[in-house]
């Protein structure tokens, strides 16, 4: 019946009305129901696939960010030269004194301050040199000079160095949860 009405109207463009199109498609509205269901299922599958891709992409970004952070930490340590944090040096001196059973800690610190170069570099990386008396002890790094190396034996420095490197290597290991694959 829709075809008859469309012929009478001389193709006036009303063929595209919903009522006429539904009648021409078949008996009732059942003609498009399967198409709508299939289209909805395809859209849901595409949405799930997109969600999986986004989750995998985020996982890969996290892995890359963690790896980059650890590589930056390693490169900072490798490029810094021979620099020991001031508290590490003092702890090594205190430990040596306790092993030798020598004088008190205060005598060691005052003697150590007299023999140190007197310059420290703040951890923020600024190039200004300051004395031990004006710089805070918690955030300073002391350059290792020849009078300092005479106090600390080479064996202790080698142990300290190997402990630091072992800790860096243990912290820089990345355990991936599975094979890194990207579906195309």
UniProtKB/Swiss-Prot annotation:
Name under which the protein is recorded: Protein MEH1
Origin superkingdom: Eukaryota
InterPro entries documented for this protein: LAMTOR1/MEH1
Localisation: Vacuole membrane
Biased composition (Basic and acidic residues): 92-112
Other facts noted in the record for this chain: Present with 2740 molecules/cell in log phase SD medium.
GO cellular component, as recorded: cytosol; fungal-type vacuole membrane; late endosome; late endosome membrane; membrane raft; Ragulator complex
Residues with PTM Phosphoserine: 146, 149
Pfam families: LAMTOR
Positions of N-myristoyl glycine lipidation: 2
Region spans: Disordered: 89-147
């Amino acid at each position: 019946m829709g075809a008859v009405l469309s012929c009478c109207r001389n193709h006036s463009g009303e063929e595209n009305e919903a009522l006429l199109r539904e009648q021409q498609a078949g008996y009732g509205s059942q003609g498009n129901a399967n198409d709508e269901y299939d289209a909805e299922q395809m859209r849901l599958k595409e949405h799930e696939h997109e969600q999986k891709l986004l989750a995998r992409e985020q996982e890969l970004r996290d892995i890359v960010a963690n790896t980059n952070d650890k590589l930056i930490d390693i490169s900072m340590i490798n490029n810094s030269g021979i620099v020991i944090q001031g508290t590490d040096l003092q702890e090594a001196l205190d430990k040596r004194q306790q092993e030798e059973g020598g004088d008190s800690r205060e005598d060691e610190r005052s003697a150590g301050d007299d023999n140190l170069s007197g310059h420290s570099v703040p951890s923020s990386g600024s190039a200004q040199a300051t004395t031990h008396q004006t710089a805070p002890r918690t955030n300073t790094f002391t350059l290792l000079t020849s009078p300092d190396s005479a106090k600390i034996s080479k064996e202790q420095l080698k142990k300290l160095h190997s402990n630091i490197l072992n800790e860096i290597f243990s912290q820089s290991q990345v355990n991936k949860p599975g094979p890194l694959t990207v579906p195309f």
